[in-house]
């Protein structure tokens, strides 16, 4: 009975559809035995196509960001360094999507061997954390720029040279469990060789719950606290400033951008992390309903998909809205760009230090 329980637990882990080890959906061993019937996978038909769409769009827009940074002459700003590293993390994350699209197409049958399973699973987790961590760094940097504009003008790129390696190291450490446990296992009742988190069978529930909660805390709760605090601080500070006429329009645009950053992060990642938390509750035995577990398994692939769209949105939030983006695009690609002009051309040159700093993050 114990062997069957372990097999059912491992098998149910596959049906969750989380191919890169961000979380594992199931209940405890007893509930897993009751829910171990083969699930319907018709809802997965659209996932590979959507993955390829996100891959193409995200890859193109992030390549533009990286190209602009590499072609930029003169010293780099701290904010530009963060944007560049964010784009690199998003590019590396998106580069793995064709493999996972194939994985979905073959209904969790991994065709690329155990080494690629471990490497690409770890690669995806690492760059997911790196992307989120750099978004957090940029929120803190923007807060300092707006609240303390004169001090922020003294920032030097060497300061970012210490923070950037630290962020990448933190992302690497956060992905170590995936690197250690990710492996290919044969799931006989599904007839596949699946790329899964191969936790020790006797401690499968504990490991799954622990990893799920770790993803919640490091990948969402702590970053969201920093991001929301920084942008609400920016909003509070700017609303106190006496802005009139065109400066008021500029201030309102900055406030809208700050709100968009917070909302984009929440919309893209909240569904995934809610399901991750429910997964942890299932592994701890708090959730024992087969119906609830089935709903989680059904929704999870689409929640992951929504999380990946954040890598497509980031360039628009952090780079393309920059005050000098059009000039950079003209100089690098030698093409006329007019779609972002609008009201910015008519802005008064007399702006507060806070607003001017916010407008030139990617100069």
UniProtKB/Swiss-Prot annotation:
Effect caused by changing residue 324 to Q: Found in patients with X-linked intellectual disability; uncertain significance
Reported effect, residue 108 to A: Abolished angiotensin II-binding
UniProt keyword Glycoprotein present: yes
Record note on what altering residue 128 to A does: Abolished angiotensin II-binding
UniProt-annotated binding residues for angiotensin II: 103-104, 182, 204, 215, 279, 297
Extracellular side: 1-45, 105-114, 182-206, 282-294
Residues exposed to the Cytoplasmic side: 71-80, 141-159, 233-257, 321-363
Tissue distribution of the protein: In adult, highly expressed in myometrium with lower levels in adrenal gland and fallopian tube. Expressed in the cerebellum. Very highly expressed in fetal kidney and intestine.
KW Membrane (keyword) present: yes
GO cellular component: plasma membrane
UniProt effect for mutating residue 104 to A: Abolished angiotensin II-binding
Lineage: superkingdom: Eukaryota
Subunit structure, as described in the record: Interacts with MTUS1.
Record remark on domains: Helix VIII may act as a gatekeeper for either suppression or activation of the receptor, depending on post-translational modifications and interactions with various receptor partners. Helix VIII is found in a non-canonical position, stabilizing the active-like state, but at the same time preventing the recruitment of G-proteins or beta-arrestins. Upon switching to a membrane-bound conformation, helix VIII can support the recruitment of G proteins and beta-arrestins.
Protein name, entry field: Type-2 angiotensin II receptor
Species classification: Eukaryota, Metazoa, Chordata, Craniata, Vertebrata
